[in-house]
């Protein structure tokens, strides 16, 4: 499966994602928008924007920021596919502001 959400939704979903990962070892691509990236957003997004990479690391979820051009984005998608093939659990592609605009 693929789950697309804002990083605020990721924060709300942490327990469910962690539980599914530990119990079912289900591969899942997480596509997460990076609200609050580099402190450039509404104040309510800044805490999660700063904390998200460390949270992903603490949960042992491999992640990459999606590239800004087609070749880089394709390489990132291939990287994610390879991680999903080798890892029983979630993998994240983080979308910085403006990348998909």
Report each predicted region and the residues it spans:
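Short coil/turn connectors at secondary-structure junctions
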Residues: 1, 23-29, 59-61, 86-91
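Short, well-ordered, mixed-charge alpha-helical segments that flank or form enzyme active sites
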Residues: 12, 37-41, 72-75, 100-101
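Active-site-proximal loop->helix
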Residues: 13-23, 39-58
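Conserved thiamine diphosphate
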Residues: 44-79
């Amino acid at each position: 499966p693929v789950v697309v959400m804002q990083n605020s939704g990721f924060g709300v979903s942490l327990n469910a994602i962690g539980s599914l990962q530990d119990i079912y070892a289900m591969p899942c691509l997480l596509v997460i928008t990076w609200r609050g990236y580099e402190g450039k957003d509404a104040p309510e997004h800044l805490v999660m924007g700063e904390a998200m990479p460390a949270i992903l690391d603490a949960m042992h979820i491999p992640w990459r920021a999606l590239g800004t051009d087609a070749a880089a984005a394709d390489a990132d998608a291939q990287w994610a596919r390879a991680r999903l093939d080798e890892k029983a659990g979630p993998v994240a592609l983080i979308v910085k502001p403006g990348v998909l605009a």
